[in-house]
A protein has these predicted regions:
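N-terminal export signals
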Residues: 5-21
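Structured C-terminal helix/loop/strand segments within mature extracytoplasmic catalytic/sensor domains
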Residues: 23-33, 37, 54, 140-142, ...
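Short, conserved catalytic-motif segment at the N-terminal edge
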Residues: 35-62
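Extracytoplasmic
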Residues: 38-40, 58-60, 66-68, 87-89, ...
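Mid-domain, small-residue-enriched loop/turn segments at the edges of structured enzyme/sensor domains
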Residues: 40, 114, 135-195
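Acidic helix-start/capping segments at beta-turn-to-alpha-helix junctions
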Residues: 48, 88-105, 141-142
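Active-site SXXK
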Residues: 51, 63-92, 125, 260
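Conserved catalytic neighborhood of penicillin-recognizing serine enzymes
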Residues: 98-135, 143, 176
Length: 290
């Protein structure tokens, strides 16, 4: 009951109307960066104690999730563990013939027929963005159940339509979608639970565990590239043709954690997009430290 009350309140906080006078210089800066970028970018940023976002630019526009949806898959596992203890210890059997796809550096090294617990698959799915590990979890829980957990958490415009597929197919179609605001809400709940030791989308203990896993992310080229060295960041990236995404909690153990989600689509110049992501991250972080 407490979790349900929090989830409703969290959604209300996330979409609280932002006063027109709030951080106009940051808003203008983000818009200028977006207009100069070859493609579309959406940005959502919020601290835990603000009733309004630091910035919300195209925050409710739909974007391809790419691998950022794996955060929801992880959150589903922990939410279900709270409801049905033992969920994280259930096993899934790996088949080279039916499971292995591209973008699976960890699972490609595993023996055929090996068994993994749900918890064991979460780490490579997040930290290495292993697509096969993600698909094994999606198959285990089911697309509908993952979407249900997202819906219960207030993710109104996030939809997992299918498993991850080989790169050639991803180029043709990407129908897993979300918004910067939805991804912001998801990370807000995980960080809120961890930072304030309260149950949100999952118990406080599991929120701590999710943040710790994301702290081990190996792809640090996007949002972390715009943040000063040494600042802790828990993030999850995602890439497909025309899209470079990153969703993060900046300084998750500090006094003022920042949830920042940056989604893109229609990119024609990845170097320029990377520069734009760095500029956005730098501007958002700078706005909170004076």
């Amino acid at each position: 009951m407490k979790r349900a009350v929090f989830l409703g309140a969290a959604a209300a906080v996330l979409f609280f109307p932002r006063p027109t006078f709030a951080l106009p210089s940051l808003e203008r800066h983000i818009r200028a960066i977006a207009h100069a970028m070859p493609g579309k970018i959406g940005v959502y940023a919020q601290t835990l104690d603000d009733r309004s976002p630091l910035v919300a630019y195209r925050a409710r526009d739909l974007f391809p999730t790419a691998s950022t949806i794996k955060v929801l898959v992880m959150a589903t596992a922990y939410a279900l563990e709270d409801r049905t203890p033992g969920t994280l210890d259930t096993t899934v059997t790996f088949s080279h013939a039916s499971d292995l796809i591209g973008g699976s550096d960890f699972m490609s090294e595993q023996p055929d027929g090996a068994t993994f617990t749900v918890r064991q698959l979460i780490v490579p799915m997040i930290q290495l963005s292993d697509n096969t590990a993600a698909n094994m979890l999606i198959g285990h829980f089911g697309v509908e159940q993952i979407n249900d957990v997202g819906g219960e958490a207030g993710l109104q415009n996030t939809h997992l339509a299918r498993k991850f597929i080989d790169t050639a197919a991803i180029v043709r179609v990407e129908n897993n979608v979300t918004t910067p605001a939805d991804m912001g809400l998801l990370l807000y709940q995980i960080e809120k639970g961890a930072h304030e030791d309260i149950p949100t989308i999952a118990s406080a203990t599991f929120c701590h565990e999710m943040i710790a896993i994301m702290m081990g992310q190996t792809d640090r080229e996007k949002i972390p590239g715009g943040i000063p060295p040494g600042v802790p960041i828990a993030n999850k990236t995602g890439e497909i043709t025309g899209t470079r995404n990153d969703v993060a909690v900046i300084n998750p153990y500090g006094n003022t954690p920042i949830v920042l989600t940056i989604l893109t689509k229609g990119l024609t110049n990845y170097e320029a997009a990377s520069s734009a992501i760095h500029q956005v991250a730098r501007a958002v972080y700078g706005s909170t430290i004076g």
